[in-house]
Each structure stands twice: as C-alpha cells, then as structure tokens.
Amino acid sequence: MAKNTSGRGQRDLKVKVKTARGRKLSSTRWLQRQLNDPYVKRAQAEGYRGRAAFKILELDEKYRFLVPGARVVDLGCAPGGWCQVAVKRVNALGERSDKRVGRVLGIDLQEVEPIAGAEIHQLDFLDDGADDRIKEWLGGKADVVMSDMAASSSGHKQTDHMRIIALCEAAAYLAFDVLEEGGTFVAKVLAGGAEGDLQKLLKQKFTKVANVKPPASRSDSSEKFVVATGFRG
C-alpha cells in the first residue's frame, strides 16, 4: 500500500473561500475562519446555537458552578448557547431523576427563540425594578448570574474596552441584588487596562475572583472572562 505523504486523511482539509464580487476581503476572511473553526463545527454537530457555548462549558469544567438544582440567570442570553449549556448542567428538564432540578432564566433586549428547559424574558436588565422581576420569575434568589454580553463595536479598541467594562459593572451590580450568598458571577470582559476597578469591586463582594481565557476563546481576541465565586451577600 502506498504511503500517504500528503497529510490528507490525517487531518481535516481547510476550506478556502474565494472573495466574491461585492464581498469585502475582511468578510471573506471571517467566513473562511468560521468554516475552519473546530468549535463552530462542534456547535453544529452538538446542537448548540453558537461556538460561545463551549466557553461556558470550559469555565464550568474548571469552576463547577452549574450544578444540578442551581438557579441561573443568563444576561444578554441571545442567541441562547449559554442557556442551552446551563439547562443540561443544572438538570432544568429533570432528565436525571437522581439529581435536583434547577432553573434557567434568560434575559435579553431582543426576542430569543424558545429553549427547552429555559424561561426567556425580553427585558432591559438596567430598567428600574429589573432585579425584583428576576427574583419573582426565579421564585427566589439566583445561584449563578452569567453574562456573555458585549456592547456594539465602535471600531475603536479602547472605546470598546470601556463600554464592555461598564456593561460588566452594571451586570455585577444586578448580581449583587439577585445572588444568593455563596453564589457565582461570570462575565465577559475585553482586556485594555480598565479591569482594575472592576476587580476591586468584585473582590469586595466575593471570596475569590479570577480572570480566565478558556480554550474556546480565540487566541487573537482580547476577550477573557471574570469568574467571581463565594458571594458574601
């Protein structure tokens, strides 16, 4: 039998995308990256709504905050990948009869397609009284508040950094109001220098605060995630 020296059969071939008339080169590069991204392929194969699902999966593998019976709030939940992960991890559908049944509440400004096992509400979490409505929907306080939110990109790196830090701080203040003692806060940030104040804020309220870049986060992205555990109340 002839030896395979081309490398084919040893790994998946990369998909090359031609630049179509009217399509920008940047769009072509993005499409090519998507088509060759193993996390995109896994998301499609496993039924997740986006590759971001693997970020929360990897964070939970390390910190174990999505446990059966937990009550979870997902801020800015569209398109729903994080909710899908949470539903499975907290046993929201009661599929594991020997485990406690959790609850998953998704919050977003836009309408989100229904997710089995999750309760989705169209709400601006910055609205007055949003914290009370969330606790009412949950039937009590949350064990986990998580956010993969990002402000609309301005194209200016530092401006985008400041916007997402402000959004993360707003999410943190909501978490202070709705979290059960001992709870966990997880949120996306972009590196850029202003994380210090956010870290100080979270360290006042949580016993441990970590900055993590999970493997599913692209290496060329400045995103990372803050994981704050042990809410002091």
UniProtKB/Swiss-Prot annotation:
Where, per UniProt, does this protein localize? Cytoplasm
State the SUPFAM superfamilies in the record: S-adenosyl-L-methionine-dependent methyltransferases (SSF53335)
Question: Main site of residence?
Answer: cytoplasm
Q: Which Gene3D superfamilies match?
A: Vaccinia Virus protein VP39
Under catalytic activity, the entry for this protein gives: uridine(2552) in 23S rRNA + S-adenosyl-L-methionine = 2'-O-methyluridine(2552) in 23S rRNA + S-adenosyl-L-homocysteine + H(+)
Q: What class of enzyme is it?
A: transferase
Assigned keywords, A-Z = Cytoplasm, Methyltransferase, rRNA processing, S-adenosyl-L-methionine, Transferase
Q: Does the keyword Cell wall biogenesis/degradation apply?
A: no
Q: What is this protein's function?
A: Specifically methylates the uridine in position 2552 of 23S rRNA at the 2'-O position of the ribose in the fully assembled 50S ribosomal subunit.
Task: Indicate the family of this protein.
Answer: Belongs to the class I-like SAM-binding methyltransferase superfamily. RNA methyltransferase RlmE family.
PANTHER family on file: RIBOSOMAL RNA METHYLTRANSFERASE, RRNA METHYLTRANSFERASE 2, MITOCHONDRIAL
Name under which the protein is recorded = Ribosomal RNA large subunit methyltransferase E
Q: Record the organism.
A: Ruegeria pomeroyi (strain ATCC 700808 / DSM 15171 / DSS-3) (Silicibacter pomeroyi)
Give the source lineage, highest ranks first: Bacteria, Pseudomonadati, Pseudomonadota, Alphaproteobacteria, Rhodobacterales
**Gene transcribed to yield this protein:** rlmE
